[in-house]
């Protein structure tokens, strides 16, 4: 049954629990991200990469093994965990991933799509 759910509904992968979750008082509310899909927490809030990224890399590969174009990363926690999670998602999904960003003014999440293999002229001027 779980396979049918994951095939049809996008998943919002919350990289680490919201700070304060462990003591029952999360610092912020992520309920608005449910608009984009079912929220799945990958790592505990106290997870850190101190010396060796090996064990967490293995854990993230296992947890993100079904990551697809329709899924999202909700970036939270240790910057090294964020970087590693993006690298793993890119490796699994041919360089493509989407993130959710909270807009403080509009009080809502926005999606941003990335493709690290997107090609353009290297010397091309920024059009931003």
Predicted features by range, described:
Residues 1-72, 84-128:
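Long, low-complexity, Lys/Arg-enriched
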Residues 75:
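Short, surface-exposed polybasic-aromatic patches that bind anionic ligands, especially phosphate groups
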Residues 79-81:
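Short beta->alpha connector loops
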């Amino acid at each position: 049954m779980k396979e049918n759910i994951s095939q049809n509904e996008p998943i919002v992968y919350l990289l680490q629990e919201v700070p304060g979750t462990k003591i029952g008082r999360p610092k912020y509310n992520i309920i608005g991200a449910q608009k984009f899909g079912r929220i799945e927490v990958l790592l505990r809030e106290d997870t850190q990469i101190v010396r060796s990224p090996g064990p967490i890399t293995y854990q993230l590969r296992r947890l993100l093994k079904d990551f697809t174009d329709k899924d999202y990363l909700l970036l939270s926690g240790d910057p090294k965990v964020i970087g590693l999670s993006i690298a793993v998602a890119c490796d699994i999904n041919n360089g493509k991933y989407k993130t959710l960003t909270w807009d403080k003014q509009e009080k809502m999440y926005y999606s941003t799509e990335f493709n690290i293999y997107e090609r353009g002229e290297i010397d091309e001027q920024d059009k931003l």
